[in-house]
Amino acid sequence: MIKWAIIFAIIGLIAGALGFGGMAGAAMGIAKFLFWAGIIIAIVLFVLGMTIAKKVT
């Protein structure tokens, strides 16, 4: 998911540099959402992994 966030951020930066303000804003919004969604999923999986690892061992 972080990979897609970086791709959308690059698209947003290029679109902004070329003057496509609306498209740049939308791409950056998608990039921001994907970045935070990826971080939240990673944290949840880390916590679940730590709690399950304690129960298994």
Swiss-Prot record:
Pfam family, one: DUF1328
Top-level taxon: Bacteria
Record's keyword annotation contains Transmembrane: yes
Localization annotation: Cell membrane
Transmembrane segments: 4-24, 33-53
Annotated membrane topology: Multi-pass membrane protein
InterPro entries: DUF1328
Gene Ontology cellular-component annotations: plasma membrane
Chief location category: membrane
UniProt key word Transmembrane helix: yes
Signal peptide interval: none
Keywords: Cell membrane, Membrane, Transmembrane, Transmembrane helix
Family the UniProt entry places it in: Belongs to the UPF0391 family.
Protein name per UniProt: UPF0391 membrane protein XCC1302
Species: Xanthomonas campestris pv. campestris (strain ATCC 33913 / DSM 3586 / NCPPB 528 / LMG 568 / P 25)
Taxonomic lineage of the native organism: Bacteria, Pseudomonadati, Pseudomonadota, Gammaproteobacteria, Lysobacterales
